[in-house]
């Protein structure tokens, strides 16, 4: 079993999740981040292997997602909450992308996602997303990216990886050190 979702594949999975939640009579909220948020809302060419999300009620959504995995022949953890420990809190600018009868699905705003992507700074997976998010946020300098990261993660040290990626995107421009 392998899962690879494009925008339509994500919608199909959410429709199936809607049916499973309806069987249980339970309403749920999902806040999608990472590659799935990019694929469904910000980059039509993007695909993802899973759906990273924060969801409630957690146990019921997990059970329903397992049923969806069986029905659609997806990986058992196609819907997971592995990124929740990296989420910087509430996103007042989130966007609704799917309103079923039982689940409500929203994605993180471009700035929120940019902060998460910069914090993770996985060069193999995040650089293209970072470029798209920079553009969507109307940013054009290294300093602006650092400010977004600091605004969502004010107590975290900016990883060297993030500085490296930003320097790669803006050669010749050096982001300021946090202490200056």
Language-model regions, residue ranges each:
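Compositionally biased terminal segments of proteins
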Residues: 1-180
